[in-house]
Amino acid sequence: MRQENSSRLTKWREPLPTELRSASVVLSERDLSTTMPVPLHGRCDQVFDNGRFLYVVDTKRRKKPAVYLRDVIQLSVYRVILERESQRLIGYHRSVSPTGYVRVTGYGTTSYLQVKLLTTTQVVALWNRYWELKTRKAAANPRVAVVQVCSACDQAPRCPRYQY
């Protein structure tokens, strides 16, 4: 019975990207954090090491394979944390790839979608903007008002685009 189960497992494969085929998973479902360059934290689904770079991977369950800006930001935050904290988290320092992957599962299929990650400077700029809005030192100024987003925003009463 044991051999039967293990043979079924060895036949199951996902269409891994080239960079990940020979890589090892060094972190899985792990909380990550850093205080530098700004305080950041998150829970990364997987981090792969192919001997040259660390690759961040986050799994999303979706009807269609798609990447959203929030996915890129999330993976980029993990990249910034790992650049600073890989020694502490995995026991050695390794550069983090400027690309990551969104692993999209749904309806019996799995796809790995490559994304270009934001730089540390861009992540810090987003962090600063978030806190400017949160502490009301800046006003929101979206290009377009989106009802689903704007109705939950605490900046809506002061926003020039929100008129619902």
What annotation goes with each model-predicted range?
Residues 71-84:
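Short, charged, amphipathic alpha-helix that recurs within catalytic cores of restriction-modification
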Residues 66-73, 118:
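Short alpha-helix boundary/capping segments
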Residues 11, 60-64, 116, 134-137:
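Context-gated lysine
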Residues 23-41, 84-164:
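Metal-dependent nuclease catalytic regions and adjoining charged, substrate-binding loops involved
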Residues 1-30:
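Acidic-basic catalytic patches of nuclease active cores, encompassing PD-(D/E)XK
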Residues 40-65, 76-78:
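Conserved catalytic cores of phosphodiester-cleaving nucleases, focusing on short active-site segments
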Residues 43, 51-53, 72, 97, ...:
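A structure-centric signal for secondary-structure junctions around beta-strands
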